[in-house]
């Protein structure tokens, strides 16, 4: 897919020319990430997971139009994670759109060991407590000691696993049955780790 890729953005050209070799450099450049191929090149070990496929219907003059809405998460299980949604009249294109959008929303999770029960100084957990919200859903992630695992609902667990966080407690409020909001709230909580407390 990336062999015949012709970059359209400045960041894409820098990556294609080999001037930017890592995802860290790409994000530090502050150039907008608008091409999923950039992520494919810089993070070849990226995995994706479809969290939800739902049907959305809309009434038009010609009748009822049905589309599929897909929510997907991507991550390399080593600090990078992104989430995205995609809509299309067929399932396969909707999945591809969601995965591409997730790649464009990728960021680096700041990992650490913020658990008072552990204090090993490793990067198996989070450096401090973080909270994220989306719609009615509020997710709080708390650093856990080594060996705890991910204590979270299924959707949040899949997002956290792909981010490469191994030990964490979580508390949720709101309609966690709404997969999109549950996933986005978890994503927003992880994003807060970028703003490290000094």
Curated annotation (Swiss-Prot):
A GO CC annotation given for this chain: cytosolic small ribosomal subunit
Keywords, sorted A to Z: Ribonucleoprotein, Ribosomal protein, RNA-binding, rRNA-binding
Pfam family, one: Ribosomal_S5
A molecular function (GO) term: structural constituent of ribosome
Alphabetical list of PROSITE patterns matching this protein: RIBOSOMAL_S5, S5_DSRBD
Keyword Ribonucleoprotein annotated: yes
Domain annotation S5 DRBM: ranges: 46-109
Swiss-Prot/TrEMBL domain comment: The N-terminal domain interacts with the head of the 30S subunit; the C-terminal domain interacts with the body and contacts protein S4. The interaction surface between S4 and S5 is involved in control of translational fidelity.
Subunit structure: Part of the 30S ribosomal subunit. Contacts protein S4.
Recorded family membership: Belongs to the universal ribosomal protein uS5 family.
Cited HAMAP family: Ribosomal_uS5_A
Protein name: Small ribosomal subunit protein uS5
């Amino acid at each position: 897919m990336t062999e015949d890729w012709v970059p359209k953005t400045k960041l894409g050209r820098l990556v294609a020319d080999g001037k930017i070799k890592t995802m860290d450099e790409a994000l530090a450049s502050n150039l907008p990430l608008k091409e999923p191929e950039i992520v494919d090149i810089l993070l070849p070990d990226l995995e994706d997971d479809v969290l939800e496929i739902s049907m959305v219907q809309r009434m038009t003059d010609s009748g009822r139009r049905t589309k599929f809405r897909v929510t997907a998460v991507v991550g390399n299980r080593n600090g990078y994670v992104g989430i995205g949604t995609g809509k299309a009249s067929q399932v396969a294109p909707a999945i591809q759109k969601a995965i591409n959008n997730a790649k464009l929303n990728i960021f680096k999770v700041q990992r650490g060991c913020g658990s008072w029960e552990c204090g090993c100084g490793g990067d198996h957990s989070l450096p401090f407590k973080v909270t994220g919200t989306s719609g009615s859903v509020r997710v709080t992630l708390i650093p856990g000691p080594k060996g705890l695992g991910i204590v979270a609902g299924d959707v949040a667990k899949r997002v956290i696993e792909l981010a490469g966080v191994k030990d964490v407690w979580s508390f949720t409020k709101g309609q966690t049955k709404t997969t999109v909001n549950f996933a986005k709230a978890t994503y927003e909580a992880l994003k807060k780790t970028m703003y490290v407390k000094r």
